[in-house]
């Protein structure tokens, strides 16, 4: 360790003290040095004086990079027949996120989802003639800390181009940064919940009139408790869905059917205040604390950040009656368009608004 005096100036001594590095006094250092080098029976003495200078939490080396291919088809995941836009089944954005998370969990045994950051829908996957023969997940570890957590950048792509062309180009569909941890933090409380039942609208109304295009397996909204310009509160419960129906996208530690209700909530709000349909674009951050089990009664609170005729950005919180969180989403954003109303099968472009009274 550093000795006081000599090259350790008063300024350098203060710097060591700020960093909790012990400076050895001349008297103590001289005494220990003399005792050690003059003691019998030590051919090669090694003397350590002072506190440990090991810096905790140093990033580990050897970041992994790998690719995984998957063929996707509707026959193996028939649940998406209940997620049609127009006539075509579409992979829900949150199921794409769950797909990337699931691959990380399989490749990193012992780790669990903590968060997804900067999730983007670049080109959604449709189960029609545009469905690629194969999809590639590219994973790149970008940070790892002493086995406590690892951050993985994930991208989903496919090859596009003419069959006769000499080279096909990658087409990117989704991207995010997944944080995997060995110990998920305790679920915090969402302390700004509004459980007032001022509107009391059955969720079935929105599924039946085409505000929401989702079929029975995705119909988890039981009631709209309240709705206003600043947000809304929903009462929810997920239907039972077999593993066989979910197929290649079977939910494990992160239930995408629960998270999908967040985007359904945004759709209800978009119709109420803009008379438009909406589709997911991105989420700044999703934090996951515990899973929502089927038939569990839970609530979804939405707080609007900003909205316009073309976009809606909001924070969404899935929680129990006391406010204890399951999942929260910061900066979720959807694109708005009145042309989506027809695709969603909206039956009456004024009825939905009139049913929600201020």
Regions found by a protein language model. Give the residues of each.
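Conserved thiamine diphosphate
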Residues: 10-27
């Amino acid at each position: 360790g550093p000795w006081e005096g000599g090259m350790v100036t008063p300024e350098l001594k203060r710097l060591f003290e700020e960093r909790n590095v012990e400076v050895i006094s001349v008297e103590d250092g001289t005494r220990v040095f003399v005792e050690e080098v003059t003691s019998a029976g030590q051919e090669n003495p090694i003397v350590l004086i002072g506190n440990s200078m090991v810096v905790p939490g140093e990033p580990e080396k050897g970041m992994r990079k790998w690719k995984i291919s998957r063929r996707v088809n509707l026959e193996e995941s028939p649940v998406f027949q209940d997620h049609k836009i127009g006539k075509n089944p579409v992979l829900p954005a949150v199921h794409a996120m769950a797909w990337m998370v699931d691959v990380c969990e399989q490749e990193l045994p012992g780790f669990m989802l903590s968060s997804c950051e900067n999730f983007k829908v670049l080109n959604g996957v449709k189960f029609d003639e545009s469905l690629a023969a194969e999809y590639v997940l590219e994973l790149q570890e970008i940070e790892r800390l002493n086995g406590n957590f690892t951050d993985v950048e994930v991208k989903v792509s496919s090859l596009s181009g003419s069959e006769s062309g000499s080279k096909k180009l990658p087409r990117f569909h989704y991207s995010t940064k997944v944080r995997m941890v060995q110990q998920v933090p305790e679920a915090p409380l969402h302390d700004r919940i509004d459980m007032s039942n001022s509107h009391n609208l059955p969720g079935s109304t929105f599924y039946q009139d085409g505000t929401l295009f989702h079929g029975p397996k995705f119909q988890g909204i039981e009631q709209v408790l309240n709705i206003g310009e600043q947000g809304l509160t929903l009462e929810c419960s997920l239907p039972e869905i077999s593993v066989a129906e979910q197929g290649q996208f079977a939910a494990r530690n992160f239930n995408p059917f629960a998270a999908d209700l967040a985007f359904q909530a945004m759709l209800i709000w978009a119709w109420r205040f803009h008379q438009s349909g909406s589709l997911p674009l991105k989420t700044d951050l999703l934090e996951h604390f515990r899973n929502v089990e089927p038939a569990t009664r839970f609530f979804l609170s939405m707080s609007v950040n900003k909205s316009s005729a073309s976009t809606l950005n909001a924070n969404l919180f899935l929680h129990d009656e006391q406010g204890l969180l399951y999942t929260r989403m910061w900066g979720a954003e959807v694109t708005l368009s009145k042309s989506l109303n027809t695709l969603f099968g909206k039956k009456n472009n004024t009825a939905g608004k009139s049913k929600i009274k201020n």
